[in-house]
């Protein structure tokens, strides 16, 4: 099933011509590399250059793009070389461990980062004032550093043969050697990845329930005015009684202060949240959930194959299924820029600004009424 010699396979003699399946693998992985490097580079430059994108969600997106770009530039060329040499590793055992460490590092980093993003998306919708006050540049840097630290903690132990990194011939890459769970320690790593994915979708599910319960604004409740002598004061008063008294048409004492007109300090200091701002946060939430869902869909076949190896000892994973699952996990590094440019209007507008041949964006939409969140 996997290479169990303990050392990467070396190629001796002349290279044999690649088969048809090898050509397909080379073409697909080359296309994935080009799309990933170009798309992530363009997206990263836009976020760095445009001041309008210097916000917490785009800082997290920048981190994801840089990680995917580095993964494509560092890990994928070794896979191309192994496919070109007949599914064999032509480099040293140490380089195999380094490449495997980086591949696992970027996988767990994406999972941890997507979970943190889901939490911030929930905070942005459900507790917007707290989110706007606390989610500063330094907070974003702390979240990103935490995600990288946890990823290193997950990817580093196999370097010391705790769940061994080896070249897997069927996958054409250096990665975890998944064997029967009684003979290996990789089950814990796979469970951690599955728990992260489940927790991320649970947070988005909670966000969806929150939006469903708050899909309509509460109706205005009219409070009746209070009167004992036809002065009509209180929360429901309009001030007409006081105006009549000043004009000389009233009798008796001056009407009391209109308590309902005056706002307390806490209500007056509440920040008004524009409807366009609410729509922007929801748009970002949809974009990041699409990224999360694609991460799950593209990695799920490979995760199923890993669990198959861990729990099923008698039957090996079909070769075509495993090859398809591995290349789907590679494709995940290229889909984020495509999703972002399709679902994010701000990114498309910035891209049109820096690409005059695509035309300029239309006139900005008129500002909509405000609502208090």
UniProtKB/Swiss-Prot annotation:
PROSITE patterns recorded: G_PROTEIN_RECEP_F1_2 (PS50262)
Membrane topology: Multi-pass membrane protein
Disulphide bond pairs: 96-174
Pfam families: 7tm_1
Keyword Transmembrane helix: yes
Positions glycosylated per UniProt: 3, 184
SUPFAM superfamilies linked to this entry: Family A G protein-coupled receptor-like (SSF81321)
Entry's Gene Ontology molecular function annotations: G protein-coupled receptor activity; gonadotropin-releasing hormone receptor activity
Residue spans crossing the bilayer: 27-47, 60-80, 98-118, 140-160, 189-209, 288-308, 323-343
Protein purpose: Is a receptor for the SMIM20 derived peptides Phoenixin-14 and Phoenixin-20. It mediates the Phoenixin-14 and Phoenixin-20 augmentation of gonadotropin-releasing hormone (GNRH) signaling in the hypothalamus and pituitary gland. In the ovary, it mediates the effects of Phoenixin-14 and Phoenixin-20 induced granulosa cell proliferation during follicular growth.
Protein known as: Probable G-protein coupled receptor 173
Organism of origin: Homo sapiens (Human)
